[in-house]
């Protein structure tokens, strides 16, 4: 799996050249004076512009349907169509979403085992669904999908 993660990272195309919140999801957004504001920015850095988009759209804490996910993605892509190639954006978005959700599964599992914080375990099946959503139609994930299917059968992932 590590080899596949390195392969995916090597296939990111966008430069690390923009502010990235790194924890950009609905719970860290607030309305302030009729504007949208972010909180919890201590982990921000310069990174890939698709990272926060993946964090927001494929947020494990906020279940949304594919139609809404596509609307948000398409809105962002349209706003940035002169700056970013569509194929490049989608590639990086899907890779970062998959890697982020794999990391989330690991963190939530560690919290349960090490710290006895089991409340996050209920979110893991949705993380798997988000991973599945992104890898099912993209050939770049073929080997990773095979490894995940071999090591984490759908029964374990709670996917039906």
Model-predicted segments: where are they?
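ATP-dependent phospho-/nucleotidyl transfer catalytic cores
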Residues: 1-22, 30-33, 37-39, 59, ...
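Conserved protein kinase catalytic core
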Residues: 29, 46-48
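Activation of the activation-loop gatekeeper triad in protein kinase-fold domains
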Residues: 40-44
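Active-site activation/catalytic loop segments of kinase-like enzymes and analogous catalytic loops
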Residues: 49-84, 98-115, 127-134
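Histidine/acidic-rich helix-loop-helix segments that form or flank divalent-metal centers
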Residues: 83-91
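ATP/Mg2+ or Mg2+-diphosphate-binding catalytic cores
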Residues: 106-160
């Amino acid at each position: 799996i590590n080899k596949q993660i390195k392969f995916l990272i090597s296939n990111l195309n966008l430069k690390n050249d923009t502010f990235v919140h790194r924890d950009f999801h609905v719970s860290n957004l607030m309305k302030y004076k009729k504007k949208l504001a972010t909180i919890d920015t201590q982990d921000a850095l310069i990174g890939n512009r698709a990272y926060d988009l993946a964090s927001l759209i494929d947020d494990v804490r906020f279940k949304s349907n594919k139609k809404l996910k596509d609307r948000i993605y398409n809105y962002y892509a349209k706003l940035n169509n002169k700056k970013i190639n569509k194929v490049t954006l989608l590639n990086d978005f899907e890779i970062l979403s998959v890697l982020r959700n794999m990391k989330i599964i690991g963190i939530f599992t560690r919290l349960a085992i090490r710290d006895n914080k089991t409340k996050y375990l209920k979110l893991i099946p949705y993380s798997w669904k988000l991973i599945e959503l992104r890898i099912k139609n993209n050939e770049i994930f073929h080997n990773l999908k095979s490894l995940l299917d071999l090591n984490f059968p759908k029964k374990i992932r709670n996917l039906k």
